[in-house]
C-alpha cells in the first residue's frame, strides 16, 4: 500500500480545471466533496505541484520550432515527449484546454468529469437509426479538452485489441503495421507492474506508462470471473496470446492514481528546455503553401482571441483525435473540395477521405438488480483509507475494471472476438446519498452489463459546420445503419442475461430489470424484436472513435495518410492518433493511441536523422534515443 508524503517540496498552485464539488451537480454530497478536494490537494502525489509540466507552459511561443504537435491528448503528449528526447530539436505542443484537475487523478471519480469544462461535449447530428430516445436523437460524445485529452477522463482500461486487427491493417497496404511490427511499440511505453503474472513475451517494464491492476476490487468482480468460467471462458490476460475470455483488466494507473498521457509522458520531460507547451490555445489552421503544398507553420488563437502565426522548420503533427484531427485538416483546406467550398474554406489540396470512415464501438446498457446490503458508504472512513493508503473504494472503478471478449455468430472469422462486455456498479463517486451503489426502494442495488460491438460495420463522417474554428464540427455517426451491428448487440444482451443466471451471480440474487424501454411497448419483452428496438432507443456509444483520417496507400481514394502517417499530397504534415486507424481495434483505444504515437515519433526520428530504437527478432525494443 502506498502512503502519500505529508509535505511538498514546492508551493501548491491555484486549482486547475473543475473541482470535484462542481462535478456533483445539485447533490447534497457537495460539501463532503468540497472538503475532500482540500485534503486531496494536500497530497503531493495527487496534486503533484513539483512534477507537473507547468515549467514548460508558455504564454508567448517562440517564432519558429522544429516540430509543432497539435493536441496534447492521449497521442499528442506522447509524440511531443518523444521528439523532445532529441536535445537539438525544439518542440512545441499546443493544447486547446488547460492542465488536468487534481480530482481526475482519483480512479473512482472518472465519470465526474464527463460533461465538465474539460469536455468538448460534442453531440452528433440527429441519428436516423440510433439514440432515438435522446434529445433530438443526438448521441453524446465526450472528448477531453485538457492536457492529456480523453485519457484524463476515460475508464483507464489498457486493452490493445486483437492480433488480427493489426495484421489486417498491414494487409490493406500499410507495411510496418502488422501485430509483430507494432508489439515493440506497445512494449516501449509499458511499465507493467505485474510482469511476473503476464510474462515478458507480450509485456515489458521500464516504460513511461504504468500498467497494472487497481489495489481494490469489490467481491462481485471475482464473482463475475467465476460466472465467466461457468460459461466456459478462461480468465486470462487478453493482451497476450489469446484475446477471448474474462479478466480484471490492467489499467493505466499506479498506486491507485490515474496516469493520463500527460502525467506519464510530459511530466518526466518537464525540465527539457527544448519542449514548450501552449495551453488554452486553439489551432485555427495549418499553414500550407498553395503552390508547393509545403507546410510552413500554424495559425493559433489564444483564450482571449488573439491570433498569431508560428512557423515550423521540419513538420507539423496533428494529434487532435478522431473528431478534431479531420476538423483541423478541413479548416486548413485539406479535404473534399466541394465540402470545403460549401463553408467558404479555400481548398488547398483535394483529399476526399478526410472526415470519412468515421466509426466507433457501440453498446447497450443492460440493467440488473442485485441483493447486497454490505457495501460500505463513501464517507470519511473510506476517504481516509484512500488518502492515507491509496486503497479501498476510491482506489478503483468498482466492477468497471472487469471485462470480457468473445466471438458471436456474427463474427467475421471464427473465434475472432467481435463483442466486449463492460460492467458498471460499485463506483465510489458523488451519489445522492453517498452510498456506493445506492440502495433502491426494494433494498436492492443496480448494476449494468453493457455489451459493445467491437467490429462495427456502420460508418459515418465529419464535416465543418462553418469556417469558424471554434464552431464544433458536424458529426454524422450513422450508428446501427448496418443491421449486423444490431444483431451483434442483441447477441451480447442475451449473453449478459445468461451470465446473470450463473450460480456465482445467483448468490447475489442477480436479476434483469424488466422495466420496458419506452417506444418498445409493442414488442414482447426480451424477444429479439424487443432488444432490436431497445438498442435503437437507448444506444450507448463508446468513447472509442476512430478512422476519420484513414491510413492507406495512395491508390485508396479514402486514404488520408500513408503507412508513415504522412498526409497524402502535402509535405511536412502527419497525423498521429486513432483517426488513422483503417478499422478500429477490438477494445478500448487508449493503448493503441499511445502505440500509434510511439511508432509515429519513431518514424519522425528516423526520417530526420536522429538515432532511433532498434527492433530485434524477439520483438524487444532497445531504448536508444
Curated annotation (Swiss-Prot):
Which GO molecular-function terms appear in the entry?
A: flavin adenine dinucleotide binding; glucose dehydrogenase (FAD, quinone) activity
Q: Does the keyword Protein transport apply?
A: no
First-level EC class: oxidoreductase
Q: Name one GO cellular component term.
A: extracellular region
Signal sequence region: 1-42
Sites binding FAD sit at 66-95
Question: Its domain of life?
Answer: Eukaryota
Catalyses which reaction? a quinone + D-glucose = D-glucono-1,5-lactone + a quinol
**Which co-factor is required?**
FAD
Q: Which EC numbers characterise this protein's activity in its record? A: 1.1.5.9
Give the annotated active site.
Answer: 544 (proton acceptor)
Which InterPro entries does the protein's record reference?
FAD/NAD-bd_sf (IPR036188), GMC_OxRdtase (IPR012132), GMC_OxRdtase_N (IPR000172), GMC_OxRtase_C (IPR007867)
Task: Note the PROSITE patterns from the entry.
Answer: GMC_OXRED_1 (PS00623), GMC_OXRED_2 (PS00624)
Keyword list, A-Z: FAD, Flavoprotein, Oxidoreductase, Secreted, Selenocysteine, Signal
| Cell compartment(s), UniProt | Secreted
Looking up PANTHER family in the UniProt record yields: GLUCOSE DEHYDROGENASE [FAD, QUINONE], GLUCOSE-METHANOL-CHOLINE GMC OXIDOREDUCTASE
Annotated family? Belongs to the GMC oxidoreductase family.
Protein name per the record: Glucose dehydrogenase [FAD, quinone]
What organism is recorded for this protein?
Drosophila pseudoobscura pseudoobscura
Lineage of producing organism: Eukaryota, Metazoa, Ecdysozoa, Arthropoda, Hexapoda
Q: Which gene carries the instructions for this protein?
A: Gld
